[in-house]
Amino acid sequence: MELNIDAYLPETYVREERLRVEVYKRIAMVEDEESRLSIEEELIDRFGDIPEPVENLIRIAQLRGVTRKLGVSHLSLRPDGVHLRLDEQHMPEPDRLFEAITKADGRLRFAVAKKPELILCERNLSPEAAVELAIPVMTKVHDELSALKTAAKEPAAPEKA
């Protein structure tokens, strides 16, 4: 991910190194809203209010989790929006992906230059705003793809005579 954003566990927040490593591992497992809320609750209970760099770290982990499911191999923030490069070997089938992004958000574009990528078109975003915007949009794309897969597996209803 190419985002110029402070995302780390300060020593002043989690003082013991062993615990910091444990917390980093737990944060790395965040992949959806439920797991994000769970780790945030745990951190508040154990260490107090969550500093901004830790909040950023958690949100980036959540974004990584959802984009990994979509076959995104690289994410970068550019002046025209968030660019998500797709791994051709792990990306969803292009027709379904196109249908899912069309349903998910009108700002998403599917581009094929050197490598296929999704572009979340929103100009001049801060890194924090890019993460906040990309999480729900990419979650919606994932949900739409899941719905399309489910619909494709369901047998057609028999015609009535």
Q: Which residue stretches match the model-derived regions?
A:
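Accessory helical-bundle/CTD segments and flexible terminal tails appended to RecA-like ATPase motors
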Residues: M1-A161
